Design a protein with these regions (language model features):
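FIC/Doc superfamily catalytic core
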Residues: 1-258
C-alpha cells in the first residue's frame, strides 16, 4: 500500500450487503439480549503464573480485564472513543507480556510488516513517524458523523479494518482492534459481553486465510478501499454468533414455560 496517498476513505456496495443486513436484522433481539450462552462467560482474573506456559493464561486474564474496562467505559451516550482509550485497552491487554521493543500502551516507533504469502502477501503498517497523526485522524473518523449513520455492525467493522491497516502497535493489534470494535457496539446499544461476538475464532478459522486474504485485497486496491466483501464476511460472523444466542434464548423460554 502506498502510504503517502492514504486517507480514511472507503466504498460499500449496499446492494451486495443487503442479504447480510437482512440476516442481521432477523436476529436484532439477540444483539441486545441480557441472557447469554455459557460459552460467553469471562475467564477468571488470575494471579500471573510463571514459565513459558503462562502466556496463554496471561492473555486470557488480560482480555478479561480489558473487556471489563471497555464494558464500563462505553455505554450508550458515553463520550466518543479517544486515542487515550485505545492506549489504555492495549496496556490492559499487554500487561506482564514480555514483547521485544514494546511498551504496553504506547505506539510503536519502528516499522512493522505483517502477512503471509499464502494469504495475499505482506502489508507494511503506517510509517512510525506518522502514527501519531494517523491515529488522531483515526479516532476523529471513527467518532465522526458519517460512520454513526451506518448500522452498528458496519461501523465496528470499519473501525476494525482501519485499525488493522494502521497496525499501530508492535504486538496485540488484533486483540486491541476487536475491543475497539466492541466499544463501538456497546455505545450503539449492542450487548457484546463476549467481546465482539467471539469473532476471533471466526476470523482465524482455517488459519485465518480468508480473513487475511480479504484484508490484502482491500489494501491492494488502495484508496478508496472497497470494503464490501470484508464487511460482508464480518457480518456473517456476527450473525453466526447471534443465531447461537437466539437458540439459547428459545431454549430458556421453552424451559420456563415447560
Amino acid at each position: 500500500m502506498y502510504w503517502p496517498s492514504f486517507e480514511f476513505r472507503y466504498s460499500l456496495d449496499r446492494r451486495k450487503l443487503t442479504p447480510h443486513l437482512m440476516a442481521l436484522d432477523a436476529h436484532q433481539q439477540a444483539a441486545t439480549a441480557l441472557v447469554l450462552p455459557h460459552h460467553w462467560n469471562r475467564p477468571p482474573a488470575e494471579t500471573p503464573p510463571d514459565g513459558p506456559s503462562a502466556i496463554p493464561r496471561l492473555k486470557s486474564r488480560n482480555a478479561a480485564r480489558a473487556r471489563d474496562w471497555v464494558g464500563e467505559r462505553f455505554v450508550p451516550g458515553s463520550s466518543p472513543l479517544t486515542l487515550a482509550d485505545i492506549l489504555t485497552i492495549h496496556r490492559l491487554l499487554s500487561e506482564d507480556l514480555s514483547v521485544e521493543h514494546q511498551t504496553p500502551g504506547t505506539l510503536r516507533v519502528d516499522p512493522v510488516q505483517v502477512g503471509r504469502a499464502e494469504a495475499g502477501g505482506f502489508h507494511s503498517g503506517a510509517p512510525a513517524e506518522r502514527l501519531p497523526i494517523y491515529m488522531r485522524r483515526y479516532v476523529e473518523f471513527i467518532a465522526g458523523n458519517e460512520p454513526a449513520t451506518l448500522p452498528p455492525a458496519i461501523h465496528s467493522l470499519l473501525a476494525h479494518f482501519f485499525f488493522t491497516t494502521l497496525h499501530p502497535f508492535v504486538d496485540g493489534n488484533g486483540r486491541t482492534s476487536r475491543l475497539v470494535a466492541t466499544a463501538i457496539l456497546y455505545q450503539r446499544g449492542y450487548n457484546v459481553h463476549g467481546g465482539f461476538y467471539a469473532l476471533s475464532d471466526y476470523f482465524y478459522q482455517n488459519d485465518g486465510i480468508r480473513y487475511h486474504t480479504l484484508l490484502h485485497r482491500c489494501w491492494q486496491q488502495g484508496v478508496p478501499f472497497d470494503l464490501t466483501e470484508f464487511v460482508g464476511f464480518g457480518i456473517e460472523g456476527i450473525v453466526m454468533e447471534l443465531r447461537s444466542i437466539d437458540s439459547f434464548i428459545r431454549m430458556k423460554l421453552r424451559r420456563a414455560v415447560g
